[in-house]
Every structure is written in C-alpha cells, then in structure tokens.
Amino acid sequence: MSTEKKQNLQDTFLNSVRKSKTPLTIFLVNGVKLQGVVSWFDNFCVLLRRDGQSQLVYKHAISTIMPAQPVQLYEPSADQDD
C-alpha cells in the first residue's frame, strides 16, 4: 500500500481557489446564491468571505460552485493535444 496521499478533485479545486483568492458564486440546493472568496474549508464546510463578513456553508447544502475566472488544477503535459 502506498504511503502517498492522493487528493480528491473537490479538495484540489477548493484549495486552488482559496490560494488564488478567486471570487466564487455558490448555489445552494434551495436556490440561494452566495458570492465571495473561500478562506477555509474542511470535509464538511466552506468558510466564504465577502465584504469583511464570513459565512460558514455546509457542503451538503451546496449544489454548484462557479468560479469568476478559469481555474487550472494541473499543469498540462507536453504530450496532450488541445
């Protein structure tokens, strides 16, 4: 068994937008639209910051996350054709 820890797509995405402070729009399952920047996250929730205010959003309530700009999650390899 490998000791190397693999990161899932959700954590990779959230960590990338957190580090780059990319503005997001988060849609909840009830239709509410939230906007802000991810300042922290764990397995169960996301801390969203906007205008000096923080909102703790539970992941089970999130439907969709839309970044305001494209997010590059990995370095494209030289052998890929785009």
Swiss-Prot record:
Belongs to the Hfq family. This is RNA-binding protein Hfq. Homohexamer. Keywords: RNA-binding, Stress response. The gene is hfq. SUPFAM superfamilies: Sm-like ribonucleoproteins (SSF50182). It comes from Caulobacter sp. (strain K31). GO terms for cellular component: cytosol. Residues 11-71 form the Sm domain. Pfam families: Hfq. It comes from the Bacteria. One of its GO terms (biological process) is regulation of DNA-templated transcription. HAMAP family: Hfq (MF_00436). One of its GO terms (molecular function) is RNA binding. RNA chaperone that binds small regulatory RNA (sRNAs) and mRNAs to facilitate mRNA translational regulation in response to envelope stress, environmental stress and changes in metabolite concentrations. Also binds with high specificity to tRNAs.
